[in-house]
Amino acid sequence: MENLVRGGRSSLGRCLAILFALVGQLQTWAVMPQEENLPAALQNYDPSGLIRFNTLDQAEKKREQLIRWIWSGGLPVDVQPTVDRDIDTAVFEEHLGGLDAQLAGRVDRLNASVSPYDYHQLMYFISPKVRTTNSRRLVILNSGHRANGAFQYGVDQTANRLLRDGFHVLMTDMPLVGFNSDNSVILPGANEETLFDARGTSGHNQMFAKLCPPMLPDGEVFRFFLEPFIQGVNYFRKTVSDAGDVSFVGLSGGGWAGHMIAAVDVRIQTSFPVAGSLPLYLRPYSPGSRGDAEQMYEPLFKEVDGDGDGIPETAAGVASWLEIYALGGLGPGRKQVQVLNFYDSCCFSTNVYLTYTAFLSELVRDLGEGEWTIYSDRSHRAHMISTQVLSEVIIPQLSGQK
């Protein structure tokens, strides 16, 4: 009898354990975005009003309009950064924490100055120790709004894998993030510096508050975010003998940067913006996706609700997000793969991308030059570049595999 009771209690305990596990799993599922139908308001959404070109010529005119809105004199493809060549490997214990120093043959520190504002950003141009067929190629990496300290969230393993495969790697940070500490600009005619007393998202919001009209011409503020990348590409093309293609991998705000720089600089052949943006009309339907000033700036990204259904469907700014996406993949031999984490813990999650992905892919394909596609990563629940994306998307695409 005692054995029966003991056995009964053991069985009851196992049953309760299973029951509690199932309840816990149900609770987890309840708070996760579900792979079900789109929200009712988004079903049958037509994104075509957010694209204002249907020929290559019209698309290139839109690209030129965007470039001239930011740089009135055109893209600064001849401007070089100042350079400290072959710096000490101690940088891997400081600004390049998370990267494997044993994979680097040389590191040059680049200082990009945005003129005439005396605003500076650092970048690190890393030459690989191993020489392969990739050693004429460059990949730019950006971590977005990362914390100070070592690179992480998959950016570190991406950099190390690329160096191991023989690529040159350009490590970059956004303004007022990571190793970029310059917090002042000198405006033309001003008697004193304009200061930003915050970093990260708050600092970026200050930049837009203090550097938009009437202080500077509209669009000029984006130079502080994008021009360093252009100078980095300029340096690569000047320095590396028989320089090859340039690619861009960015996470979060770095994904935002990847969309933007690929739209204006066609020298970026392949871009992988990871968890970087959604069109404005989708942000209310994806938790945490509102974004900071550079994500939402109305003169650029404005969308209007022309039919009164509460969901914008018409582009009204300089370039809509969908136009920027398309321009990032348009051009001979060019491609953009937008990576969105389905269960992202930060932003740009769920399946709302389905409202535009087929339309945009077909548009770029039908225009006849370039490619645009999307990859929904369901392998994790974090805000990161996953091992799956690195091994199944980035490396195969860079290797010419489909």
Task: Name every feature range the model reports, one short phrase each.
Residues N134-G144:
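Short beta-strand element of the alpha/beta-hydrolase
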Residues S143-E227:
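Cap/lid segment of the alpha/beta-hydrolase catalytic domain
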Residues F348-N351, A358-K402:
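C-terminal catalytic histidine-bearing segment of alpha/beta-hydrolase fold enzymes
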Residues N234-S289:
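Primarily recognizes the serine-hydrolase "nucleophile elbow" in alpha/beta-hydrolase
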Residues R85-R131:
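N-terminal cap/lid segment of alpha/beta-hydrolase-fold proteins
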Residues L280-D366:
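The feature captures the conserved acid-bearing segment of alpha/beta-hydrolase catalytic domains
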Residues V31-P76:
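N-terminal pre-domain segments of enzymes
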Residues C15-Q27:
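Bacterial N-terminal signal peptides
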